[in-house]
């Protein structure tokens, strides 16, 4: 009888997903839909446009098989993304299914917060452990200008409700833009002074459909970092499983600032995540190839060994870093199809 090793939470030596550069992948970003109800000017300014051919997004059974296989290979955290994942009618069932997967210890959700005020208690009940909410402005008119939706107050109430329900820290994402976010830095700092929010400023990335927007709105995260350092904020040491964000803290603030700067040297050195699209394609990099189809190996439980072998084999082709610094964003026209 073959002995089955007991996995210890957080032990990277037990991860089977390792690339040629000895990076270990314990984190899966799983998109469950490409549909989004916001029209953010930096992502989908014209709104979601369905493709001419009919698409089928991963169903509940396929997601269950996928999560189980990744967990068996050492994945401990799954982030559910979109589009806007909470638009799926079976969203709660999906979360509950993943939460019942042995080996998965964290289930994070990236959402625009559209349904948060109403549904956060349900999300918590089915197993959402971590939250990332997109809030690109704290000014209602500016927020509507950026997103196409007048939902800021509801989203902010949803965040407060999450704290009331016991969430200890919430990550809030804002895309760093010259005309918008940068001008509101003082507002964001005041907001997090007495709230345990990690306010993450994500540097605008150049994608195929948004070249002109990038040229007019891109602002280096270093600009923000230098200001914060001058005001007494201090860079925090990174833990082994931390992502690419550079986190700053200040003794007078309950919240933190996170800066995600993909154009920085060595940005990819700490990569620990793989992505699967809503249509079942494995993406080794946010700015990479067309993706490797996995759906033919999600038809039955008996295919798990073949699926695991395909994942491990594909990982050996992962590049050491992206090529954004030379203007190559791969095939990515926008980030809505894979959730960033």
UniProtKB/Swiss-Prot annotation:
Transmembrane region positions?
none
Cofactor note from UniProt? Binds 2 [4Fe-4S] clusters. Binds 1 [4Fe-4S] cluster coordinated with 3 cysteines and an exchangeable S-adenosyl-L-methionine and 1 [4Fe-4S] cluster coordinated with 3 cysteines and the GTP-derived substrate.
> Mind telling me which InterPro entries this protein's record contains?
Aldolase_TIM, Elp3/MiaA/NifB-like_rSAM, MoaA, MoaA_NifB_PqqE_Fe-S-bd_CS, MoaA_twitch, MoCo_biosynth_MoaA/MoaC, rSAM
Q: Know the name of this protein?
A: GTP 3',8-cyclase
Functional description taken from the UniProt entry: Catalyzes the cyclization of GTP to (8S)-3',8-cyclo-7,8-dihydroguanosine 5'-triphosphate.
PANTHER family linked: GTP 3',8-CYCLASE, MOLYBDOPTERIN COFACTOR SYNTHESIS PROTEIN A
Specify which residues bind [4Fe-4S] cluster 1 according to the UniProt entry for this protein.
36, 40, 43
Q: Which parts of the sequence bind GTP?
A: 29, 79, 110, 171, 273-275
Please report the stretch or stretches of sequence annotated as the Radical SAM core domain.
Answer: 20-246
Reactions catalysed, semicolon-separated, are: GTP + AH2 + S-adenosyl-L-methionine = (8S)-3',8-cyclo-7,8-dihydroguanosine 5'-triphosphate + 5'-deoxyadenosine + L-methionine + A + H(+)
Gene3D superfamilies, per the entry: Aldolase class I (3.20.20.70)
UniProt GO molecular function: 4 iron, 4 sulfur cluster binding; cyclic pyranopterin monophosphate synthase activity; GTP 3',8'-cyclase activity; GTP binding; metal ion binding; S-adenosyl-L-methionine binding
